[in-house]
Regions:
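Single conserved hydrophobic/aromatic residue that forms the stacking wall/gate
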Residues: 1-5, 349-360
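Sequence-level preference for short, compositionally simple segments enriched
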Residues: 6-351
Length: 361
């Protein structure tokens, strides 16, 4: 982790090996009718539990300007139990939060986003996993080129609660997938939690069957629950003619309302990175995701290891068999060793953002 100015960055090389995880949930105190008591041992509401002091998520991000790369965020209760109650892996409560090549895993309520309409989240090339409302909350969230992985029959992906947001939850060029249980044709794209939520899926590759209606009821009438250019595994357009357009709330004061299920190509063209993420103040998290080229002409000489300079690099970190042996701003290292192994270069550059670059023996 590093603090760059007012920005917090958490990065590593491999999200499959770098895992922030904990076993907890927010289940209430059991009563005489509670059949399964296993959850209570890991509940934050249990004063005798080791997680009683936690807020209810494995990781809570309370401040703006947060960036994470190659990290997995896992709630072990959700993943292991494959059951409720609510078990967050992540809760993000601020503006300008971005993730690249990360994993988020649980079962119910995997990731709760901010409740403020003006806040922005950007997610690229990530893995979101769960079964019940596993991406929920508010704010403008653009999720691109990511996998939404469902783990049970009747999974529901999103449950937004926007008040008067402009874009809401936007999924562009994403993949919807799941295990065998989730592939039974009962999967839903989402349901409206509170207020006037919005969720749009654009250019989605759907690998497992969706329920024909696509969406389901919850606590309010959505402002917009829609798709554009949803495709099956063969690239064939999905039939959206049976998608849900009429909604009904539950509770004592039931309400009915309508919401269209598709948007036009002209409308879809407005759901861009520039409009959703950059337009307000020029925030550009993609710049932190850019790859520098690998160091070239790596060679051993009498006075150490040398390589050609990489334009834009501020420095170089040498990692040998998992151990950092040198950090330098030069294009050579005085490190010498007869130890055989993999030399891993990690570049430090102007964002600044470390990158795994080149291995040499």
């Amino acid at each position: 982790a590093c603090l760059v100015g007012s920005e917090m960055c958490i990065r590593d090389r491999d999200k499959e090996r770098t895992i922030i995880h904990l076993k907890l949930n927010v289940g209430g105190k059991p009563d005489a009718n509670t059949k399964d008591l296993a959850y209570w041992h890991y509940s934050v509401h249990n004063p005798k539990s080791v997680v009683s002091h936690f807020e209810g998520a494995v990781v809570n991000i309370n401040a703006s300007d947060f960036y994470s790369e190659n990290i997995s965020y896992v709630n072990d209760w959700g993943v292991e139990a494959q059951n409720g109650p609510q078990a967050l892996a992540l809760k993000t409560k601020a503006d300008r939060i971005a993730f690249y090549n990360c994993k988020f895993r649980s079962f119910q309520d995997t990731w709760m986003t901010t409740t403020r309409d003006a806040d922005r989240h950007y997610v690229k090339e990530c893995w979101l996993e769960g079964a019940v409302d596993y991406f929920y909350g508010g704010g403008n969230a653009l999720v691109e080129e990511s996998t939404l992985y469902n783990v049970r029959s009747g999974s529901v992906i999103v449950a937004p609660c926007h008040e008067s947001v402009k874009y809401g939850y936007v999924f562009r060029n994403c993949v919807i997938d799941g295990n065998e249980q989730a592939a039974d044709g009962k999967l839903k794209l989402g349901r409206p939690w509170h207020n006037s939520p919005k969720a749009v899926y654009i250019n989605t590759l759907v690998k497992i069957p969706l329920a024909p209606e696509g969406w389901t009821n919850m606590g309010t009438i959505p402002a917009l629950f829609a798709e554009y250019n949803s495709m099956d595994m063969n690239g064939k357009a999905l039939d959206l003619s049976c998608r849900k357009t009429e909604y009904e709330t539950g509770g004592k004061e039931k309400r009915k309302g309508e919401c269209r299920a598709t948007i036009t190509s002209n409308e879809a063209a407005l759901y861009t990175y520039e409009n959703i993420i950059k337009s307000k103040d020029g925030w550009d998290p993609r710049s932190m995701m850019e790859q520098l080229p690998a160091p070239a002409h790596i060679r051993w000489e009498q006075d150490g290891l040398k390589w050609d300079a990489v334009p834009g690099a501020l420095g170089y970190v040498l990692d040998v068999n998992g151990k950092i042996v040198d950090i330098t701003s030069d294009t050579q290292s005085l490190w010498k060793s007869d130890m055989k192994g993999v030399v891993l270069f990690c570049l430090l550059y102007t964002s600044p953002s470390p990158r795994d670059m080149r291995r040499s023996r």
